[in-house]
Design a protein with these regions (language model features):
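Carbohydrate transferase catalytic cores enriched for Leloir-type hexosyltransferases
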Residues: 1-362
């Protein structure tokens, strides 16, 4: 088979979908996974991690016009057998069978988190993509339920295939980057783009309470600000009495991120809506316990290997952070549950099952 892949998310800085595609493509380079298929990667500019397939760079900006007009013409010219669209939308008018991945549908569940134009674009394209594709892939039972209830898609059409997890544990002997000067102490880490649904102001407020009691506590925020309506993260940090111990890394290259994971004693991710929530699982794979909001998808993804707090309770969040950083007994309990949780997330299994889905969609 000639399998086409929309590879736009592999260009530029890595994204969540880009890392997801990198994990699948890495497995598909292995002879036992490839099954003799040819992979054709399509993008509007050069892509990273393309070893498993030939890259077709097509002119354009990579926006909706590119996806709906330029890409279908190239698919027809290359006589591909199936198209995998890993990022929420797909060409709506093509004879090529399609499989689309909808990792979450926050833009439909909580439209107030998006500008009206962007939210409308996402809702229309994702709903139509799910309707015209042979199969829909998602990463959790929670997301499957959301797609069924909000888009009216037949449950039998939706496949749940959890991704693998890439451990951020650094290589033995790897030194910290010279520009990253980490102070001694107990470091709490957040990694992920900053959205309103992830409640960074609550995290800063709760950490401020903890840091007032513990002079060795540090908070590191890693991620760019994508809030809508806009939240001024810098102002929130500067208003904290412990602002000097709150460090915001708007972007961290891989070596810096590995160093932050190496120093972290706890991970916090106060998100009220995710398709799965990969960064807490990555932290767990590095031996770092996580604190999450108590949501259905958080329970599904991390089970007994995380501690949970209710939305909006700053005091409860502060108490849980304190346990995460300073209560060795609580940390051991969470660590004991980690292997069973992590066993559900394996790239070889995800790649095999995704390839089987593409084969069946032909």
């Amino acid at each position: 088979m000639r399998i086409a892949i929309d590879a736009r998310e592999l260009s530029g800085r890595p994204t969540g979908v880009g890392r997801y595609m990198t994990g699948l493509l890495r497995e598909w380079t292995r002879p036992e996974q490839r099954h003799g298929h040819e992979f054709l990667l399509y993008s509007h500019r050069s892509v990273e991690n393309s070893a498993s397939g030939s890259v077709r760079t097509l002119p354009g900006t990579g926006g909706t016009f590119w996806e709906q007009r330029t890409l279908p013409a190239a698919l027809a010219a290359d006589a591909v057998d199936v198209l995998f669209s890993p990022a929420y939308s797909t060409p709506l008018f093509t004879a090529v069978p399609r499989v689309v991945a909808l990792h979450d549908i926050s833009f439909a569940a909580r439209p107030e988190w998006f500008s009206w134009r962007e939210g409308l674009r996402r809702r229309v394209l994702a709903r139509r993509a799910a309707a015209v594709s042979r199969r829909v892939l998602t990463i959790s039972q929670f997301s499957k339920g959301e797609i069924v209830s909000r888009f009216g898609i037949d449950p039998a059409k939706i496949a749940v295939i959890p991704p693998g997890i890439d451990s951020p544990i650094p290589a033995a002997g790897e030194a910290d980057p010279p520009h990253l000067r980490l102070q001694k102490g107990e470091h709490l880490l957040y990694v992920g783009s900053i959205f309103n649904r992830r409640h960074i102001p609550d995290l800063i407020a709760a950490f401020t309470q903890v840091a007032a009691r513990h002079e060795d506590a540090w908070l590191h925020l890693v991620g760019d600000n994508r809030t809508h309506p806009f939240e001024d993260v810098t102002a929130r940090i500067e208003a904290s009495p412990v602002a000097r111990r709150i460090v915001w890394h708007q972007y961290a290259p891989d070596e810096a991120l590995r160093a932050l994971y190496r120093q972290a004693r706890g991970f916090v991710f106060l998100s009220e809506y995710e398709g799965l929530g990969l960064t807490p699982l990555e932290a767990l794979s590095a031996g770092i316990p996580s604190l999450l909001l108590d949501t259905a998808v958080a329970r599904e993804s991390c089970g007994d290997a995380a501690c949970y707090v209710p939305l909006g309770s700053i005091g409860a969040i502060a108490t849980a952070i304190e346990r995460l950083l300073y209560d060795d007994s609580a940390r051991r309990t969470l660590a004991a549950a980690a292997p069973a949780t992590l066993a559900r997330y394996d790239w070889a299994t995800a790649a095999r099952d995704t390839l089987a889905l593409l084969e069946a969609a032909r």
